[in-house]
Amino acid sequence: MKAARQQAIVDLLLNHTSLTTEALSEQLKVSKETIRRDLNELQTQGKILRNHGRAKYIHRQNQDSGDPFHIRLKSHYAHKADIAREALAWIEEGMVIALDASSTCWYLARQLPDINIQVFTNSHPICHELGKRERIQLISSGGTLERKYGCYVNPSLISQLKSLEIDLFIFSCEGIDSSGALWDSNAINADYKSMLLKRAAQSLLLIDKSKFNRSGEARIGHLDEVTHIISDERQVATSLVTA
């Protein structure tokens, strides 16, 4: 019965741009709580996307909802710069850190002093920025440049990471949904973040308030896997970490 109901939800979403939980509840004659449970399962399976009380079907040929890097740089830039500045306190001489290709980490790289650390990243803009520092040992993931996101895609990433003991992985994401799942706008960046999240000794999530209660096209992991979080919405961030 549940499988049939969930397929009915998918069928309805295929014929609409998006639908609310209430609309699905009325269509299928079940409670909103039942619909929410079904939507959570369908989202975990990667079939639908939930955002602000609405659900839409993910068309497999177009699993990429992200903005280009230069657009993301301008979005909430003051908050991102402040969050990045706070993250500097977590970085010490001698550390091996990894950065993702997010605009928030680019703001961090801009403010990073020229100290004796190793930095591993898949970000082309961050490589360009940190290439100006003489004491920072910069390690690029290499691979094919995905220009839209300013990141490198390397199928040999797993073997490359075997020789690196990463002390701290600093990253951002497209959103955190109500269940604590971490999402990104595309599979390219989500795969990189998921891998680093598992390998690093500690992780530091940098996220501005616009990202809470949002999902995306590709799942990174869960907030349970993150050791620390910095946000401009401290109350929400604290409740998520302690939940």
Swiss-Prot record:
Domain HTH deoR-type residue range list: 1-57
DNA bind region: 19-38
Key words, A-Z: Activator, Carbohydrate metabolism, DNA-binding, Fucose metabolism, Transcription, Transcription regulation
InterPro entries: Carb_Metab_HTH_regulators, DeoR-like_C, DeoR_HTH, NagB/RpiA_transferase-like, Tscrpt_reg_HTH_DeoR_CS, WH-like_DNA-bd_sf, WH_DNA-bd_sf
Any GO BP annotation: regulation of DNA-templated transcription
Pfam families found in the cross-reference section: DeoRC, HTH_DeoR
GO function terms (MF aspect): cis-regulatory region sequence-specific DNA binding; ligand-modulated transcription factor activity
Source organism, top-level taxon: Bacteria
Job description of the protein: Transcriptional activator of the fuc operon.
Protein known as: L-fucose operon activator
Organism: Escherichia coli (strain K12)
